[in-house]
């Protein structure tokens, strides 16, 4: 069985998807389904869109996950609001269930004695588990089971468990439906057997749930911050008998069971309403959704989910070469370990699966709810590392580096909505608290305007840990780059207030400083006030490379937005003048590296995880080989070399992206493989379920272990795509950093390019053999590879076959 198929990129079923569903069916699913307040039932597909197993991209496993290791071994499902980790044990299916808005904490607007924000679970708050669901099956002990299989079917967006007891074949299918706003678990059997057991629904904050009629369970509660939450479960049985009592739902002699779980909170993304919707009854919503979905045949629930999922997942197809039959015959964890062995053959289909897993997580975690946090949408308990927050100094941004290049631009809207909803609170807190005399990062001019954030943010307008002056510019950059891919003026109009407010902050913050150049001449420059280069070095340095690069980029983006929208021309001219006066990082005469600080003697930690001074290389373009002076480019390369090739997952992903930008394919590829290596014990690397593991003991405390942090699951696939295509508005470069392992032959369709284009291409022996470009909003660009260059002009929707 080719669980990670060699022909994953050539899918005839993808081309027939619209035919199966009917365009009139598919498009309403994308437009309305899964809305948290939707009362109209989702439209249902008229034909099954389920991709057959031989064409689906699957991650197979030969054993169930243990409850104690569910975060490393459990398989994730999600619909953007509800997420679950699924264990797959025959005797007890365990689900750890989360709801994206279930957060403790609040605005956290009182500064500490040092002028910074409290950063504890009690004050800042934390992302929390909603429930644990246990489906216990009598007579299904592991010792009685044969032919056990468990898999994540990424193409169809579901988890399956299969096993045999005697002559009966048991199958489970689990998925989180966006159209039906529900988690669904379907149990089937073939043969003489049936299902007998009980269901427990546990509120992770207040204990067991209670019966809800003959075929349901439910609970409702309220966190200490007043946030109300609820979950409701409904069961439909094929034959047999259902009964409830003592907080349990028992089932007897059922040939099949459909279990539907829904959950909600009264969170509202509106600070003016106190981040609560007083009209919202989480229990009523959960019960109504569960009841509605439970009346729909399980196969139709699955078809509706698959249609919605595939409309996103199928936008990108990738082939990087063929793996061997022996590699295909391994289960996923064995395959990950085999790839890391010495010596080891390339396993390009495994690498494609890892890339597509990042896209699967994007679809599962980022739809119409809050954006992906440090753990995406998945938890094992109510005490996650760093409260599973929104870190603004690389992690939140990295969560979205994969989306637009991989055809999932629609998933970025969760980040846009989050920033827009938080903006009034961020602005108010900035203008009332940033210049507090206790804040060492305050504006020494005494001026204040616009908005910024702290390193950590929560969904209640709250900030945590240190102030992060340049965090506003980096968040704006993420939103601006989404516009670069889509060329959607409506999106640009939405983010314009964020761009302008960030510029206003920096207009008030920048200070004039006399700079002496290498030739002894002096000049006046504008520099960042006292600041901290994430996350090391002096905490009172001026003109840090990190902020200077981000502000230079922000000012350029705002000027373009102003011109495109025809707004605030006079203010844009002011920003242009400021941009021209900005100090930009220089080359240390001692190390030859790009300086992180204005002092040539301060090199900081040579191997530090952050690449803060290289913002102009990635995510920026100022230091790209096409644009940068050779001396600056070499200085950036030397700094990147000094940072090393070993770090945490997200830091290796960032390094890989930078090496791809520099055209060093083999170093970029080596870093991809570093992240793909198996996490043994607590080490950095990939867990059995492909989640990235972060070894906390490397922060100096050997008692700390490995934790899940999701950013590398997006950043590493983003680096893989960056190796295949580089783009900026007006320029698309094919195969800029193609490693030898992928050079023999490959294919990609639907690859996003800045400027408003998508690219399909195939290559052989490292050279493109087929190239097509489609406009999704762009009109002009230059397409190049090797010594070839083509100037392209297209109308929206037009496709040009270049080669």
Regions found by a protein language model. Give the residues of each.
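Acidic/histidine-rich catalytic neighborhood
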Residues: 501, 505-561
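Non-catalytic carbohydrate-binding regions of carbohydrate-active enzymes
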Residues: 478-486, 490-491, 502-512, 572-604, ...
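Well-ordered alpha-helical segments within folded domains of soluble proteins
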Residues: 393-404, 468-480, 546-556, 610-621, ...
